[in-house]
Structure formats: C-alpha cells, structure tokens
C-alpha cells in the first residue's frame, strides 16, 4: 500500500483465478495487471489448468470497470491452446476489455522441463514442440484483427 503513496508503479501478475479475493482497497493500489488468459473456451481452460474459466473472465471485467490498465498474456501451446476457435474466444474477450493496452502472445518453450523432473513429477508437455513462427504470427494476427496492440 505504501509503494503507490511513494510514487512507485505497482503491478499484479495473475491468472485472475483468485481475483474475487482482491478487495477494492487492494485494487486501488494497483496501476497495472498482467493477466494470463490461458484459454477462451471453458473446456480448454479446464484441460490446461484444471480449473474454471469464469473467475478469470470476471476478474478481467472487474479490472476494466475500475479503469485499471491490463496487459494480457496468452501462452501459445501447440495442440493445446492453438485451436483457432480458442484463440478467437480469447481475442473476443480481450477486445471487450477497454483498459487492455497490450497483448503478449508467448510461444511455448521447454525451459521448465527440469523443474518437473526435480519435483519428481511427470511433465505432461514433454513431447510438445515450440510453435512455428507461422503459427505465432497467425495467432498474433487474430488479436490484431481486433485492433489490439500485440507483441
């Protein structure tokens, strides 16, 4: 709370799943939210996260209604989040949030693989390739077609 009073820019990095737990007072102290939207379709979201999509959608709308700047991040995972209908659903949702100033399409990579092994856990995406440059551009274009600033 004191950071903003000292003129320090404040940011929250979140999937939005627990956004309902943020009080209005907490949100008053946030300048920017990095909102990870992992899917626009409930079934795909559940497959990716094991959770419901609605809390993320609700939190994004709440942020926009409060005038809080949002940067949306979308992780592009071949065979998981790359379906055109899924990307369209995310892009439509994001385009409806007036305070989104940036969309980052983040190509999937394997840099976290060792973390799973060190935890003794099976890594479900072990055989998943990085998306091709053409796929990344297709997805970015889907967001750009809605006049969004895309990186």
Can you say where each PLM-predicted feature lies in the sequence?
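Radical SAM enzyme core and accessory elements
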Residues: 145-151
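Conserved AdoMet/S-adenosylmethionine-binding subsite of the radical SAM
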Residues: 1-117
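A structural motif corresponding to the C-terminal lobe/cap of the Radical SAM core domain
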Residues: 92-95, 101, 117-142
